[in-house]
Structures are given as C-alpha cells and as structure tokens.
C-alpha cells in the first residue's frame, strides 16, 4: 500500500509540474492517500451570517477514487493568492462525493465541503430544555455533537434571560439553533482556528456591532472595470438597494402569571428616518414582563432596519467573509464607517480568476437575522404525555397555581421524577374568579394530550386526559354500561347517571361511612338487578337533615314533578279538619265545665308556622299512614304545647306502665260513651291530695266491693243526704234526720256505752320544690357575691334579697312547679 501511495504522490507532482500556469485552488484530504493528485477545475463557496458555509468543487483525478476515503472525512480547501500571501482556507468535512465522468485519461468528481457545525443538520430531534438561556441551550447542542470548547465561541453583550421551557420538536439540531439565534437577536460566522486546520474553523456566535471583524483593517479601492483587470484587489461593482420599512414595532402578549394586564410595548430605533412608515403589531411573542415586551419590539425593528439598506457588490478581495468590516475609498452616505459583509459567494477555476459577489449593510447597524414568524415551527393538534409526580405520590401533585408536571412521550432524557417539564396549566370546561372552577385531579401516570397556545412549542398546556390499555375507560361495551354517564374518582367516589330506557336512575356514593349513598329513580344492585325504585339515602355513619327555613316531608305524590316545592294543600286540609274536630270537642268540654284544649295555640301553629313553612318548622305527612318505631326509647317533647288529634281513635298501649303527669291539671272529657278505668290486678287509687274530690253522675252511682268491704272514712264529718233526710257522723256523735217516717228493721237492737274506731286516715305526701339559685357574671362566669336581686313569681309577688358569698339566693319553697323570673339589681351607689 505504501508503494501505491508513493506512486500516486509522484504522479500528482508530475501532473502539477506539467500544467501550464499556476494552480491556485487545492483540496487537502489528509485521510485519503490519493488526494494529492486531485486537481480543482472550479469551485463555488457560499457564506452567510447565521448559516454554515457550503463549498462545492469540481475536481479531476487520474484514478477512480474510493468513496470511503473521502465522504465524511476532514478536508481543507485552499485559495492561494497570486502574490503568495496568506491563503484563504475553508476547513471542514466532505459531505457529498459524486463521480460525474470517466474517461481514459481522468475521472471527474464533485465534492461538497461543509464546516463541522453543519453536522447538526443531519440530526433531527425532539428534546426539552428547562431553566436555560439560549446560549446555554446552543452550547449543550454543540457539545452533544462532540464540539469542544475551542471549536465555538460566544461574543455577546446582552444579558440573556433564563427560559423556563423550550421545546425542540422534530427539528434538526441546526434548525433549532438557527431558530434560537433568530428569536434572540444572535448571528453566527466562522473564523480560522488558532489550533490548526485539522480542527476546522471556530463557530462564533455574536449579538452586537462590537463583534464584527474589524482587524486586520480591510480597506480596498473601488474601481469599476472596463473589460480589463489589473490583478489588484478591488471592488469593481457596487449597488445600493434601499426600501421602506416599518417606522416602529409594537409587541404584546398575555402572561397568565401576570393576568391583571396584557404586556405591551413598542420600539422606534430610527426616529429621524422619514422614509419609514407604519407600526406592525405582533401579538404572542411569549415575553413575560414589560422588559420582555420592549425587547421583542426592539428586536423586530432592528431586524427590519438591518434589511433596509443593502449593498451588493463584486470584487476579487479574498479576505471578504461574513461579519468582516469592509471600507472603500468610495463615499457611502449611509455607511460612513464601512460596510459589514453579510453574504459572500466565492468563485474560481482553471479558466476563471478568483472573484466574488457579496452583500453588506452599514456597519453602524446591528445585524439581525431576518424574522419571519410564518416559518417558525408550529405544532398543530396535540402531543401525548404522562402526568408525573415524585416518589409515587398517590394524590394529585400540584403546584401552588394548580399546575401539573408532564413527561412528554417523545422525551427519553434523564430527568428527576416530577421534573420532566415546567408545571403546565390544565384546560378545564369551566374556570373563573372567586374560586369558581371545575377540578378533577390528574394522578401520576395519567395519559394527557398536550396542546400549545397558537401552536407555539414553547407554550404547552394540558388539553385533556385520555384512557389507554393500562388505564382503560370506566365505560365500555360490557353489560348495560353504554347507557351510563359516570364520574368516578380513584377512591370510588361516584356519580352515576343511567339512561337505559325505562330504568333511568342516578347514584351518588362514597366509600366512607360504610358506603354513604343517594340513589334516585330505578335502584339496582351490583349485578344491575332491580332492588327498588324512587329514592334512597343511606349510610352506616351519622345522618343529618337541616333546613334553616323549615322542612316538609311528604308522601303525597306530585306527578311529573309539576307542583310547587311547598305544595301542602292535602296536609293543610287534614290539619284544618283536625283543628275543627279539636274546636268542636273543646266547645263540648267547656259546656260540660271540663278543661278545653288550647285550640288557639293549635291554630297559631298551623297558620303561623306550618302553612307554607312561614317559620322554621317541620311538617311530615303521609296520606296512607305513618309510624315511628324505636328499638329502645321514643321521646316526643315540646317546649310549649304537645298536640295530638285523631278523627277516630287514639290508642295508647304499654306492656308495663303508663304514666301521665301534669304540672297544673289533667282533664279527661268523653262526650258520648263515657269513661272506663279498669285494673285487672292491683289497686285503683284516686287521690285529691290538696283539695276536694267530687263524684257526680246524672243517674245512678254504684260503689261495690265484690269480695271485700266498702270503707268510707272522713276525718271531720261524714254526711249522707238524700231528698232532705240525712245522716251526719262526726267524732262527737251521730245525727240523723228526716221529714218523714223512719223505719228500722232488725232482728234486734242493743244499746251499750260509748265507743269509737281508731282513725287510720292516709297522710298525703307533699311534693316540695325547694331551690336556691346561683347568680353569675355573664362574661367571666364568676359568682356574684353579696349582690342584690329580685324574684318575681307568677302570682305577682316579689322577693328581694342579697346573694351570699357563693352567689346563692335564698331557698325558694314552692308546693308546685312554678315559673319565676330573677332580676339582678344594681348595687347601691353603682350604675
């Protein structure tokens, strides 16, 4: 192999020596052993600010070349000036290799040379960048492609903001870098590496006029040609193109983190230029504050002004390159300090001397890449992702603003769990102020569809959630489920609405409290079999029904739910009938001098409280019957009156005792069929412990002892009267009298000395209500010692006293239950 290489090198040198004239263009490929024999027929190199250059060369070689020795191999193209000065170098790698012609004498080839950074054009990626500036993002991309720190450089003046989120989606790495430069006001160019051509050229990113290439100074004459060339470096053609651009720019956007106002500002960098007109308004520039709005407007105006005046020239100046400052002896009113080159197209060949065409702008203007937002990437539709939470957090992992972290399905980079994206907003069917909204939490692993505001990849939000094979839909084709509308949470809190025809129903349930449920309509069990209809409210925990204005519980039907909420005509009619019955019986009781029912109170209850629930009452009604049952005790209590009315019978039964106690009076009145009091066993005792007892009948009164005695006893006197005749018995004697005859029928009569029976009167027990009351300060609760008070009784009497050291009043002794009022009097000398 070494012999072949030596032979080819010898052939190459011989060919070069045999050529007439000098060879100014060379392509060096160190990895190709036969590259020395390459001869450049022609070349064209295109350089622009913000783009990797592209050099195409047509070459010949006496042999057929192996593709693998050239394609993707480092190479350097040299343009050597005729005066032997420093050559112009293009260092990079061969990106294209084509054999275009083969003859007996040579083979023709076309090759393309690109800089190292052009490798970024070959990699399409989707990647997320967080909490990085644009420069940091660009550096990370360059390093990912193997570029070292000496192969690129940043020369910037502006302080670049840190972006919370940037998305590269289905873009080549170079297109994404180019996009960042356009959006951030950056441009790029290449300079020779001081470490040698084998490392390529240095990719330089800059942002201001200070970073143009000023040294060494390039000052050339402007000389138009007349068909002849002197060979000296000159600019021999120059055109100036000017156009009207916008006089200013306005930029605005909405930032939900500063939702109180839309962020808007404008920029005018050429107040004195009267040739400009208009103010384009750009909305959606994704700035976060007022400073950002001003910068976005300024950037767009700088880009417009950079393209306002463009010079197009032709020259043979080999040093021309993007970002180079070019000065001429011609006067350019708009470029008193020279031009900055933005584009150069180099050409040359065997039959053509080197020359170039170039474009430039006044060097006093900041160069900005042309901004064409129509070409910026837009994501139509949505991307898939998964909700992400750290440490398998079992509830919704939310930020203070209610946002979620999402891992995009295209993203395979290593992120900490719960840090795969910035927190994203969730689009909801309803949202608003005053804490209004609609919220169902998204849990770790939930699939979501991610949309983008205006299609901007840098502005994602969660559009909705979806089911998948791992998290299947809760409603499928199984059974009767297609008719169901269901909301179900991870802990089986559920709202189910079934639209199956004829079996419509609603279920609201939670697992807590042993399945607390509200079931409406057609009630089914777990197997969808009917277990009832109507409604059911149940729980294994506590239950409470509260209504501050009143409660109506009714078993009266309202077909098709057509009536009013407090429809109660039927129950009001029943209560009115009951009231009328009570009033009739009360009138009869009053006629019989019995105690009448308090019908006025009953009417007030109906009219003032129960009717339409004018006050906070409870009304329960059932047309076919009602029952209250308790496994233990049942209590009915009223602070005022307890009223019970029946059109027919009132039946009260007690297996053991039946007690009735009244603080004042018990009145029992039977209008027609009388009263029966029976005791199958045990005594029947009737006592009037503090007053008289009267037994009265319109006809006979019978007192009978079937198997014992009848004892009638009185302490002072026993008096029997009938038709004027009488028998009076007392401790001092017996007296009888009659207006008619007195007949004594007996078998005999005995008269003996005085005698009497011992008195065995029953003593009446007294129920004493002896109470002392403690008066306390209503704020501190401390007893009011030695404090005057006044007690008012129901009979109008007053008792005035002073409390003792413990705040107690004097003992109040009463024979009966009695209401009293206690007034706390002011101490003497105090208000």
Locate predicted features.
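Amphipathic alpha-helical and helix-coil boundary elements used as assembly
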Residues: 1-831
């Amino acid at each position: 192999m070494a012999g072949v290489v030596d032979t080819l090198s010898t052939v190459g040198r011989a060919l070069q020596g045999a050529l007439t004239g000098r060879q100014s263009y060379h392509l060096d490929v160190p990895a190709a052993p036969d590259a020395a024999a390459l001869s450049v027929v022609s070349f064209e190199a295109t350089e622009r600010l913000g783009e990797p250059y592209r050099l195409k060369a047509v070459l010949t070689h006496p042999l057929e070349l192996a593709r693998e020795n050239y394609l993707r191999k480092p190479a350097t193209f040299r343009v050597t000036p005729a005066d032997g000065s420093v050559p112009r170098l293009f260092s990079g790698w061969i990106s294209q290799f084509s054999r275009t012609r083969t003859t007996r004498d040579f083979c023709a080839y076309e090759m393309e040379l690109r800089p190292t950074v052009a490798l970024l054009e070959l990699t399409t990626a989707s990647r997320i960048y967080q909490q990085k500036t644009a420069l940091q993002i660009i550096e990370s991309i360059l390093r990912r492609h193997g570029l070292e720190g000496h192969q690129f450089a940043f020369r910037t003046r502006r302080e670049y903001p840190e972006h919370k989120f940037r998305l590269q989606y289905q873009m080549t790495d170079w297109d994404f870098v180019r996009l960042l430069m356009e959006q951030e006001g950056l441009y790029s160019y290449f300079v020779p590496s001081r470490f040698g051509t084998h490392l390529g050229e240095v990719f330089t990113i800059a942002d201001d006029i200070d970073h143009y290439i000023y040294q060494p100074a390039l000052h050339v004459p402007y000389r138009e040609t007349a068909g002849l060339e002197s060979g000296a470096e000159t600019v021999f053609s120059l055109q100036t193109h000017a156009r009207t651009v916008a006089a200013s720019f306005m930029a605005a956007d909405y930032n939900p983190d500063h939702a109180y106002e839309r962020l808007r500002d404008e920029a005018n960098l050429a107040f004195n230029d009267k040739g400009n007109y208009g103010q384009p308004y750009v909305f959606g520039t994704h700035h976060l504050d007022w400073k950002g709005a001003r910068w976005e407007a300024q950037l767009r105006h700088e880009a417009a002004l950079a393209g306002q005046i463009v010079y197009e020239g032709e020259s043979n100046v080999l040093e021309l390159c993007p970002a180079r400052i070019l000065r001429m002896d011609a006067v350019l009113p708009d470029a008193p300090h020279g031009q900055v080159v933005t584009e150069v197209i180099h050409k040359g060949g065997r039959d053509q001397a080197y020359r170039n065409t170039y474009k430039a702008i006044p060097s006093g203007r900041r160069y900005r890449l042309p901004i064409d937002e129509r070409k910026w990437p837009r994501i139509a539709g949505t991307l898939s992702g998964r909700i992400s939470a750290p440490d398998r957090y079992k509830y919704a992992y939310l930020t203070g603003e209610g946002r979620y972290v999402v891992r995009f399905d295209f993203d395979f980079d290593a992120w900490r769990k719960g840090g795969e994206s910035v927190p994203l907003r969730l689009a909801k069917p309803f949202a608003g102020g005053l804490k209004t909204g609609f919220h169902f939490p998204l849990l770790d692993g939930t699939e979501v569809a991610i949309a983008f505001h205006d299609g901007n990849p840098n502005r994602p939000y969660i559009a909705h959630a979806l089911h998948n094979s791992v998290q299947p839909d809760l409603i499928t084709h199984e059974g009767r489920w297609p008719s169901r509308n269901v909301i179900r949470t991870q802990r089986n809190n559920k709202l189910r609405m079934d639209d199956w025809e004829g079996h419509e129903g609603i279920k609201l349930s939670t697992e807590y409290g042993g399945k607390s449920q509200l079931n409406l309509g057609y009630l089914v069990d777990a197997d969808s079999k009917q277990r009832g209809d109507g409604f059911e409210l149940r729980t294994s925990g506590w239950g409470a029904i509260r209504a501050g204005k009143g409660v109506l519980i009714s078993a009266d039907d309202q077909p098709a739910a057509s009536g009013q909420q407090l429809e109660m005509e039927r129950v009001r009619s029943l209560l009115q009938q009951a009231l009328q019955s009570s009033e009739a019986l009360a009138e009869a009781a009053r006629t019989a001098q019995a105690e009448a029912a308090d019908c006025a109170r009953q009417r007030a209850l109906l009219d003032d409280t129960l009717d339409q629930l004018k006050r906070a009452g409870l009304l329960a009604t059932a047309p076919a019957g009602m029952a209250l049952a308790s496994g233990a005790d049942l209590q009915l209590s009223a602070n005022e009156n307890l009223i019970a009315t029946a059109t027919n019978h009132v039946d009260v039964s007690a297996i053991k005792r039946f007690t009735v106690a009244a603080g004042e009076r018990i009145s029992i009145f039977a209008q027609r069929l009388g009263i029966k009091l029976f005791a199958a066993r045990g005594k029947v005792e009737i006592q009037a412990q503090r007053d008289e007892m009267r037994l009265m009948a319109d006809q006979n009164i019978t007192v009978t002892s079937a198997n014992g005695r009848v004892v009638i006893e009185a302490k002072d006197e026993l008096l029997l009267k009938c038709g004027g005749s009488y028998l009076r018995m007392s401790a001092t004697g017996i007296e009888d009298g009659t207006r008619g005859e007195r007949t004594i029928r007996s078998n005999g009569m005995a008269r003996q000395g005085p005698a009497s029976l011992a008195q065995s009167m029953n003593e009446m027990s007294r129920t004493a209500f002896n109470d002392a009351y403690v008066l306390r300060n209503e704020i501190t609760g401390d007893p009011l010692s030695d404090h005057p008070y006044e007690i008012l009784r129901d009979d109008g009497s007053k008792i005035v006293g002073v409390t003792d050291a413990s705040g107690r009043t004097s003992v109040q002794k009463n024979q009966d239950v009695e209401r009293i009022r206690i007034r706390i009097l002011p101490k003497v000398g105090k208000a």
